[in-house]
């Protein structure tokens, strides 16, 4: 297990800027608005050949607002999980009451963990002199850095990695990556929390309370699963601040990163245009897709309610009807593990390899069932087929003239191939080549 380093402190002291520098990414949203990072998220980092995990947190505060209270609870949970704590303060705003309060809390409750007092935004000697006041916290010698410029970060990291326990050999990460996607407030974080059995994500009725992508792990039937819970995709016209826009970009990137996308929709709202855009985006990126109709416990049901609901969805998504639809409730935990099992099966379908001999037996069968016709009356000969895709199913059909293959015959071949080899939940690509 990689050591976990938690970045903690009051809002807007530069935690996300340091997180981005350590993880060499823009995974965390940075902004001058206090509380921009409202949840925990984790990324891989490496220094001097030593790998570790770094965790960003929302911020330590005493605000009575329910959302800030939840953010505070998440910060305390992050400290409890961490192996090393970087307690960050802001030299430009000076020593604050919250800094003193948090230092007392750390000294009282986490004596067994290495805690580093990190004075951030120190870009000049004068600021370093002013930073001496943070010695009043009674913690270790302060480390003066500029997360933005990189000053002092190398020396800090040398000390941090030296505090790690002896390194152990780690196995290659073979976890299947599942992106939990959907519009705001459809229950994505509640779904993840119900699976993990812990309040890993802030859950609130306020749309958009998860603005970043968050990674969590679980095991299912001996298989490692990485859950990527993303910010909801809003209609572009509703994104009126840079923060929300950047979060929607993060969702795009989460889809890019995953093996299978789990699209959650609200049972009472149904499938909307933005959901269809998300599905199309995932399909274009050749990802596995599963639609999860959440809050099914709120729907009054008759004998054929679920079938009628599924039929409406399939009418809306048209030629993407190979996507499975499941009905779940994050609140009552109905079908949650069935959803994960379906996602795992979809992931296996995405990696499925069919031998050339099997494919050509299939081809001869379908050609005998329905020989291809052409508009011009010219003869079309499909000679053989083979699988060529490395990361998702791609099949090359070799024929005398690819231009003669009609679109309806292409649909027929795809339908029969899916029926024969089961590619449920997975986009399948066909290439027609001249031979």
Curated annotation (Swiss-Prot):
HAMAP family: GTPase_Der. It comes from the Bacteria. The keyword Repeat applies. The gene is der. Disulfide bonds: none annotated. GTPase that plays an essential role in the late steps of ribosome biogenesis. GTP 2 binds at residues 182-189, 229-233, 294-297. GTP 1 binds at residues 9-16, 56-60, 120-123. Residues 352-435 form the KH-like domain. One of its GO terms (molecular function) is ribosome binding. It comes from Chlorobium phaeobacteroides (strain BS1). This is GTPase Der. Associates with the 50S ribosomal subunit. GO terms for biological process: ribosome biogenesis. Keywords: GTP-binding, Nucleotide-binding, Repeat, Ribosome biogenesis. Belongs to the TRAFAC class TrmE-Era-EngA-EngB-Septin-like GTPase superfamily. EngA (Der) GTPase family. Residues 3-168, 176-351 form the EngA-type G domain.
């Amino acid at each position: 297990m990689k050591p976990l380093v938690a970045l903690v402190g009051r809002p807007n002291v530069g935690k996300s800027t340091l997180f981005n520098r350590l993880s060499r990414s823009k995974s965390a949203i940075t902004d001058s608005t206090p509380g921009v990072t409202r949840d925990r998220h984790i990324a891989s980092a490496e220094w001097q050949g030593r790998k570790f995990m770094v965790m960003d947190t929302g911020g330590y505060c005493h605000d009575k607002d329910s959302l800030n209270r939840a953010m505070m609870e998440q910060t305390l949970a992050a400290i409890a999980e961490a192996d090393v704590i970087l307690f960050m303060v802001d030299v430009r705003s000076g020593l604050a009451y919250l800094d003193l309060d948090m230092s007392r809390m750390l000294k009282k409750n986490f004596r067994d963990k290495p805690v580093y007092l990190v004075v951030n935004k120190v870009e000049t000697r004068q600021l370093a002199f002013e930073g001496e006041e943070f010695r009043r916290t009674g913690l270790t010698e302060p480390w003066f850095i500029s997360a933005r410029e990189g000053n002092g970060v190398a020396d800090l990291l040398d000390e941090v990695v030296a505090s790690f326990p002896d390194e152990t050999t780690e196995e290659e990460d073979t976890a299947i990556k599942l992106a939990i996607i959907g519009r705001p407030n459809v229950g994505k974080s509640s779904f993840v929390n119900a699976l993990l059995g812990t309040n890993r994500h802030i859950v609130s009725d306020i749309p958009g309370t998860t603005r970043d992508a968050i990674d969590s792990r679980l095991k299912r039937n001996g298989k490692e699963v990485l859950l990527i819970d993303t910010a909801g995709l809003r209609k572009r016209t509703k994104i009126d601040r840079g923060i929300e826009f950047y979060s929607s970009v993060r969702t795009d990137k989460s889809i890019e990163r995953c093996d299978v996308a789990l699209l959650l929709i609200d049972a009472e709202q149904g499938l909307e245009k933005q959901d269809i855009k998300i599905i199309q985006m995932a399909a274009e990126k050749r990802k596995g897709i599963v639609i999860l109709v959440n809050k099914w416990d709120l729907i009054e049901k008759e004998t054929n309610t679920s079938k009628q609901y599924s039929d409406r969805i399939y009418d809306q998504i048209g030629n993407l009807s190979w996507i499975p639809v499941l009905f779940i409730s994050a609140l009552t935990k109905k079908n949650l593990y069935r959803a994960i099992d379906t996602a795992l099966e979809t992931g296996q379908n995405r990696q499925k390899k069919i031998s050339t001999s099997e494919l050509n037996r299939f081809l001869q069968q379908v050609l005998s069932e329905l020989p291809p016709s052409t508009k011009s009356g010219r003869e079309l000969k499909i000679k053989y087929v083979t699988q060529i895709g490395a990361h998702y199913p791609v099949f090359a059909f070799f024929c005398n003239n690819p231009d003669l293959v009609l679109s309806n015959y292409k649909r027929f071949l795809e339908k029969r191939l899916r029926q024969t080899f089961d590619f449920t939940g997975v986009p399948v690509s066909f290439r027609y080549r001249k031979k």
